[in-house]
A protein has these predicted regions:
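Well-ordered beta-sheet/strand-loop patches within structured domains
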Residues: 34-72, 76-79, 148, 164-172, ...
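Generic detection of long, well-ordered alpha-helical segments
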Residues: 17, 93, 133-144, 197, ...
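C-terminal motif of bacterial Sec signal peptides marking the signal peptidase cleavage site
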Residues: 30-32
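Cationic-aromatic interfacial patches
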Residues: 34-171
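N-terminal secretory signal peptides that target proteins for export/translocation
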Residues: 1-17
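Enrichment for repetitive, rod-forming helical segments
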Residues: 26-28, 419
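Sec-dependent signal peptide recognition
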Residues: 18-25
Length: 505
């Protein structure tokens, strides 16, 4: 029997021959219901009547088409001689009860029961009068598939592993899931094994704690929402969805660790973390919905005081060029210089501005250093494909606005000079006092940082700050995209249509 099934690949269940192989496997599993022990079941060849019976139960479709991890489920049972692991003497085991309870409460982990066969298991185990062999085998595999799926989702986030992932990555992901499943079955520790898969980030843990608090809320408003009686109660639905989406973002996080700078784009703030605590923070201004600040990682090795602003071409041709055509003094009044393709500074009067347009603009425009400069007095550069950086600004009143998605994409830092002083503390080359002295010279200078610091630009619409969870506007509409990807396009979740109305616009 094992040799017959050795070529089984669930991705090809639509193939009649392979489907028959899998049905034969089900018959083998129906030869007896044993506790997980490693005993090999009978190798008798099933009769045609047995195969026909299972095929009739299957009602013309593959019995396990709904499994997310069909190949792993098969591999697990193959490794364990096709012995059921969630049943004992035709009764769901205590392990099965624990797993079913976990699935019913999986919302507390930011996941949804519908993704883990909750409805099908409900029908099989609670709506059926008798637990026949079909119910035992199918429910056993559904529970196994649910465990593997939850294990993956907690460790890697709700994502689809695709052809873009390397074979080594896929093998590693699958091997980890199988090891955890085997350990769970042997040790009867479902919850602890699964919780080991979760991120250790403090932000994730605090969001999870807040979500659990809401879900366990005994208020009538909370119960009404969770029971589907209302779609949104005092923003409860939006908060639940935001918590779930951002917990999933932290599951996918891998770059943030140790000493680092985090910029939260929707939150409009910057935090510098050392030794697991925030030691510096500042308000920031980020890109508009049209000119979005990207999610990225970088490393700040130095910063520049009294920087030039090399105006991006899009701004030069779309904003500055029309002004220069209307006003011959515009460039001079705003301290702009015009550079030739060779980098030479040109006099504005030597240029025929009326002949220029976006397809004919061979010049570079830069703004001179000084208090008038749009970058302010300090610029923190780090390599990235978007030419985005952190900088000071001469428009400081904008920080008082609640909604601060106002820039062309770069991040304006309210306490930019304080950040510069902080980064040179203990610097072998330049001290904070030296920096203050250099600023008095009003000359451009590059300051090296002895200990370069990673910087992470992230999109988080809720976060734990100052002892409470804060919720932020979905300024770029990214939450809606994540929601559709996580829940909206999954046919299993269609019953939970109430949830979608909790998403912030």
């Amino acid at each position: 029997m094992t040799s017959i099934l050795s070529g089984f690949i669930p991705a090809y269940w639509s193939n009649v021959f392979v489907r028959l192989q899998f049905l034969l496997l089900l018959v083998v599993m129906t030869m007896g219901c044993h506790h997980f022990s490693g005993n090999t079941v009978s190798g008798d060849v099933p009769s045609a009547a047995d195969v026909q019976k299972i095929a009739l139960i299957d009602s013309g479709s593959a019995l396990f088409d709904s499994l997310r991890n069909g190949s792993l489920v098969y591999q697990f049972y193959h490794n364990n001689h096709f012995v059921p692991v969630w049943w004992e003497q035709n009764i769901p085991s205590a392990r099965a009860d624990s797993m079913l309870q976990l699935i019913s409460n999986i919302r507390e982990y930011g996941l949804l029961p519908q993704h883990y066969h909750s409805l099908e298991l409900q029908k099989l185990l609670y709506d059926s009068a008798v637990a026949d062999e079909y119910i035992i085998r199918k429910s056993d595999m559904l529970l196994t598939d649910a465990f593997i799926a939850i294990c993956k989702d907690l460790k890697y986030g709700r994502r689809a592993f695709t052809e873009m992932d390397s074979d080594s990555v896929l093998r590693y992901v699958d091997s980890v899931a199988l090891v955890n499943l085997t350990r769970t079955i042997k040790q009867n520790e479902i919850r602890s094994v699964l919780e080991e898969q979760e991120p250790k980030y403090g932000q994730y843990q605090m969001l999870k704690q807040e979500l659990r608090k809401i879900l366990r809320n005994d208020s009538l408003d909370a119960k009404a929402y969770l029971n589907g009686l209302v779609t949104d109660t005092t923003d409860l639905g939006a908060q639940i969805v935001s918590l779930e989406i951002n917990m999933d973002r932290w599951r996918k996080e891998s770059a943030i660790s140790g000493r680092h700078i985090l910029v939260n784009i929707p939150g409009g703030y910057l935090e510098l973390t050392e030794n697991d605590s925030v030691s510096f923070k500042s308000r920031v201004i980020v890109g508009t919905a049209k000119n979005q600040t990207p999610v990225l990682d970088g490393l700040i090795r130095s910063f520049i005081i009294y920087p030039y602003w090399n105006v991006p071409r899009s701004i030069a041709v779309n904003e500055i060029l029309p002004q220069a055509k209307r006003d011959s003094l515009y460039l001079r009044n705003h301290h702009y210089e015009v550079l030739s393709p060779a980098g030479e500074v040109l006099h504005p009067d030597s240029i025929n501005w009326m002949a220029l347009h976006k397809n004919n603009f061979p010049y570079t425009i830069r703004q001179k250093e000084g208090l008038h400069n749009a970058l302010g007095l300090i610029k923190f550069w780090f390599d990235n494909p978007y030419a985005v950086f952190l900088h000071d600004t001469n428009a400081r009143l904008l920080f008082d606005r609640k909604k601060r998605a106002l820039s062309h994409g770069c991040v304006r830092v309210e306490k930019a000079m304080e950040l510069g002083r902080y980064l040179v503390r203990g610097n072998d080359i330049v001290s904070p006092e030296d920096l203050d002295q250099y600023l008095e010279f009003e000359k451009q200078m590059t300051i090296r940082i002895t200990e370069p610091i990673p910087v992470h630009l992230r999109y988080l619409t809720c976060a734990w700050r100052d002892g409470a969870v804060e919720f932020y506007d979905d300024v770029y509409g990214a939450d809606k995209e994540v929601f559709d990807r996580m829940y909206g396009e999954d046919p299993v979740i269609r019953e939970d249509v109430q949830l979608a109305q909790g998403v912030r616009p």
